[in-house]
Amino acid sequence: MATAGKVIKCRAAVTWEAGKPLSIEEVEVAPPQAMEVRIKILYTALCHTDVYFWEAKGQTPVFPRILGHEAGGIVESVGEGVTDVAPGDHVLPVFTGECKECAHCKSEESNMCDLLRINVDRGVMIGDGKSRFTISGQPIFHFVGTSTFSEYTVIHVGCLAKINPEAPLDKVCILSCGISTGLGATLNVAKPAKGSTVAIFGLGAVGLAAMEGARLAGASRIIGVDINPAKYEQAKKFGCTEFVNPKDHDKPVQEVLIELTNGGVDRSVECTGNVNAMISAFECVHDGWGVAVLVGVPHKDDQFKTHPMNFLSEKTLKGTFFGNYKPRTDLPNVVEMYMKKELELEKFITHSVPFSEINTAFDLMLKGESLRCIMRMED
């Protein structure tokens, strides 16, 4: 492309300080260096993780910063050494990567790349420790290696999934984070058998994606657990057959679920990050074969406490990161699940706004009114 090797000026939504409205600015985006790719973003979605780091209540604030990590785009140019993608390819940026060289990448069991796994504090490129974004010479920091709230962004090639160019980017862009995390937690880690009983704790976007996984696996009973009763109606679209609100009972919810299911559920997936919900999700699975999978991120001081007999009675507890998907290897196959009409993505997309109205997307999520809001880069 004519822009290859040159600085590109474009619009980006910049977070200058915690909790303040994002500002649409003209930024300069430098060309990609070795093993980097410059992407033209066409659609980006808002994930709760973006809101969390925008609020910056519990972590080191890194500002000014360009947030955003769920997106779909087209390769504009590539840096030295990049052979996996070429200009014109359709890609999904991912907040974690796959170098294909480390022990994790070579293991069939892991997706936690030594080189490129998520780093929320790093605001620069891994190659030279510098930002590719500037405004009037001032560096603007990156976010989890993606920074998709910009018309152009620079990403390490290991954090890009090359996908079917026929796939609609305004739909499959949501597979770059939360939806794949929940879906994979069920399909790749919990692995419920057809006809089994599955409990999903927390019915936000990730929990509903885990529920979608249970539906695809053929579970016969899918029990949604949430303290907001309004979530049940929406959850039915994702296969939810029953709903339990812990607040409606005067005993621990794990006891309620054990009674409901004649001894416990076959599989549970916990998507809240609340440590008590994690304990409940583990203790509610059936002895002998039950498996609980933890997805939600806990507070740093949380302690998981349960009696060791729960393990000796052959209940299994697992954790997962990004649904155990390797970004480059596996995400293209998840896109194909959508293309084959197995995986339904439209029901996750509740809102769509032009990029210039990005603060509206934040407002919708803060009010709990949206699952996924898609932002169109071209107003």
Swiss-Prot record:
It catalyses: a primary alcohol + NAD(+) = an aldehyde + NADH + H(+); a secondary alcohol + NAD(+) = a ketone + NADH + H(+). Signal peptide: none annotated. Gene3D superfamilies: Medium-chain alcohol dehydrogenases, catalytic domain, NAD(P)-binding Rossmann-like Domain. Its main location: cytoplasm. GO terms for biological process: formaldehyde catabolic process. GO terms for molecular function: alcohol dehydrogenase (NAD+) activity; S-(hydroxymethyl)glutathione dehydrogenase [NAD(P)+] activity; zinc ion binding. It is found in: Cytoplasm. It comes from the Eukaryota. PANTHER family: ALCOHOL DEHYDROGENASE, ALCOHOL DEHYDROGENASE 2. Disulfide bonds: none annotated. Belongs to the zinc-containing alcohol dehydrogenase family. In maize there are two isozymes. This is Alcohol dehydrogenase 2. Zn(2+) 2 binds at C99, C102, C105, C113. Homodimer. Its EC number is 1.1.1.1. Its cofactor is Zn(2+). InterPro entries: ADH-like_C (IPR013149), ADH-like_N (IPR013154), ADH_Zn_CS (IPR002328), GroES-like_sf (IPR011032), NAD(P)-bd_dom_sf (IPR036291). An alcohol binds at T49, H69. The gene is ADH2. Keywords: Cytoplasm, Metal-binding, NAD, Oxidoreductase, Zinc.
